[in-house]
């Protein structure tokens, strides 16, 4: 059956969930292109009777980061559909590294994650993201994630600028390096981490692979942490 030209999804998109991805998959079966409309702050308040917990620009960037979305537009009282600029455009410029490995938990994917991953993407030809398992997070931090490892893995896998995703079950980076060599035919050239991980056991690297730290915008340091958004997520679900 021939697909229809354009499918449109309208959403508040405060968080990317498996339901978001399932909706995109269903739409992809029927339409050759998908447009996602994000409610403006004013429209969100009008529809849901409260302010969104993430700004319009943050919600747009989440939508733009998804592989199944061809373009994003603002949903407001204006009926005109105007496509917004994409969050990421592939570059043909030579990169500093061939294969970069980025480990992390990526719970309740947020702007801080996007900033970090986009910086990493600009530094390499191939971006491999390691998503920490539930067991590893508990062992390292003594707390549980809001989203399961399968959900977090699937969400990161569906980001347009991520090439490969790997479930991390140990702090031993040689295991990740072996996985990359087996699946990509070459070893990791660099490990990229957020600067908030400096000075702890994440820096231990007996394999000699360079570790480079990226800096988040200090202006958004508080709201760019998963612990902040776990609290907001719980408050949101308690009030509904």
For the regions a language model picked out, list residue spans one by one:
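Nucleotidyltransferase catalytic core that binds NTPs
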Residues: 1-240
